[in-house]
Curated annotation (Swiss-Prot):
The keyword Ribosomal protein is annotated on this UniProt entry: yes
Species per Swiss-Prot/TrEMBL record: Saccharophagus degradans (strain 2-40 / ATCC 43961 / DSM 17024)
Disulfide bonds: none
SUBUNIT field: Homodimer. Part of the ribosomal stalk of the 50S ribosomal subunit. Forms a multimeric L10(L12)X complex, where L10 forms an elongated spine to which 2 to 4 L12 dimers bind in a sequential fashion. Binds GTP-bound translation factors.
Pfam families reported in the protein's UniProt record: Ribosomal_L12, Ribosomal_L12_N
Keywords, comma-separated and alphabetical: Ribonucleoprotein, Ribosomal protein
MF terms in GO: mRNA binding; structural constituent of ribosome
Family (UniProt): Belongs to the bacterial ribosomal protein bL12 family.
HAMAP family per record: Ribosomal_bL12 (MF_00368)
Function of the molecule: Forms part of the ribosomal stalk which helps the ribosome interact with GTP-bound translation factors. Is thus essential for accurate translation.
Superkingdom, natural source: Bacteria
GO annotations of cellular component type: cytosolic large ribosomal subunit
Name the UniProt record assigns to this protein: Large ribosomal subunit protein bL12
Length: 126
């Protein structure tokens, strides 16, 4: 018997944040897609603004490209930014490149980038 969409959503709702991150990564790999691309494509369609292409970006994703040499400091910075536990933050850093924060304001994204780079990480804003 196949699982219904409702069953799948309920199973995802019971997962930890790190399990969901790993699930998304596995789905991206299996299906050859990117979750960030789906959000970027869906956002203009939801807004319905044809002239929105020239508008300034208001939401940013903070992507940890690599932890660099000071991995412990980067894990501490990730914990401070996200509020994750030690294990979850370590898994996020070990899984780089990985999203640290998604859909945040430019100021929040710049602050997170600054903290991570001071800790020794390479960071991208998208």
């Amino acid at each position: 018997m196949a699982l219904s969409k409702e069953d799948i959503l309920n199973a995802i709702a019971e997962m930890s944040v790190m399990d969901v991150v790993e699930l998304v990564a596995a789905m991206e790999e299996k299906f050859g897609v990117s979750a960030a691309a789906a959000v970027a494509v869906a956002a203009p369609a939801a807004g319905g603004d044809a002239g929105g292409a020239a508008a300034e970006q208001t939401e940013f994703d903070v992507i940890l490209a690599s932890a660099g040499e000071k991995k412990v400091n980067v894990i501490k910075a990730v914990r401070g930014i996200t509020g994750l536990g030690l294990k979850e933050a370590k898994e996020l850093v070990d899984g780089a490149p990985s999203p640290i924060k998604e859909g945040v304001s430019k100021d929040d994204a710049e602050e997170a980038k600054k903290l991570l780079e001071e800790a020794g990480a390479s960071v991208e804003l998208k």
